[in-house]
Design a protein with these regions (language model features):
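Long, low-hydrophobicity, acidic/polar, solvent-exposed interaction domains
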Residues: 4-246
Length: 246
């Protein structure tokens, strides 16, 4: 799988990550952390092992993104609570959600990590170490800012959680684009819900404002906070060779 992050509304863009060095052990994603979408040569969808109409794909992807393993991410928007009544499939044997279990990001833990890496940085004796410690430290500080902006601890998707798409070589381009659009819309709508509840603007409005005010750190922090809760990770496997049903 090649994983990319899409944060642009102008078409479908791809930026491939650099190759993984041969000496690096890449952890395998748990099955529950991957939302599988396959499209065959007849433009039919197989989602999470079952057939699905394309008009239902967006909501199915939303269910994947809001699952916590022990409940649903819900955000009060106006008089409604978005997410509270969404259905989530539970494994009857384990009692756990079949989708990713979000991990707590707690303020006390984050502050401890910040102090730890500040000490590492102060003791660093090479520029390379300083660079690496600074990068990690900045990521923990980003989490602390997100906690403060969201008003408390939050849950994030595990790093291995992603949406995986695979099409057939004979899948039509129109269907390919439709599937991509449904998946991206799922993320965008969830981001809008959270941004509206926390910051009074949709995620798209925050991005548009930041495009016109690139020096506004507050706007950037708000955008980053929303992305922390709802990252957009869409991977594309190599198309299947020849015509196959799935």
């Amino acid at each position: 799988l090649v994983t990319t992050t899409i944060d642009s509304d102008e078409g479908i863009k791809r930026q491939l990550p650099p190759p993984v060095p041969p000496d690096i052990d890449v952890p395998q994603a748990k099955e529950q952390n991957v939302f599988n979408v396959k499209v065959n040569f007849l433009d039919q969808l197989l989602v999470e092992g079952g057939p699905l109409d394309i008009e239902d794909l967006k909501n199915s992807a939303k269910s994947f993104l809001i699952a916590t393993g022990d409940g649903i991410m819900s955000h009060p928007v106006g008089r409604d609570v978005v997410g509270r009544n969404r259905e989530i499939e539970i494994d009857s044997e384990t009692g756990n959600a079949k989708f990713p279990e979000r991990l707590w990001v707690r303020k006390a833990d984050v502050k401890m990590r910040i102090a730890e890496y500040e000490a590492f940085l102060a003791a660093a004796d090479t520029e390379n170490k300083k660079k690496n410690y600074t990068k990690v430290l900045d990521s923990w500080k980003e989490k602390l800012t997100t906690i403060e902006l969201l008003g408390g601890d939050y849950k994030e998707l595990p790093s291995s959680a992603l949406i995986s798409m695979q099409n057939d070589n004979n899948t039509t381009y129109n269907t390919y684009l439709q599937v991509q659009n449904e998946l991206q819309t799922a993320v965008n709508e969830l981001r809008d819900e959270l941004a509206l509840e926390k910051f009074g603007r949709t995620y798209k409005e925050l991005e548009d404002l930041y495009d016109r005010n690139a020096d506004d750190i507050d706007l950037l922090n708000q955008i980053t906070a929303v992305r922390s809760v709802y990252p957009q990770r869409i991977s594309e496997a190599e198309p299947r060779e020849g015509s196959s049903y799935y």
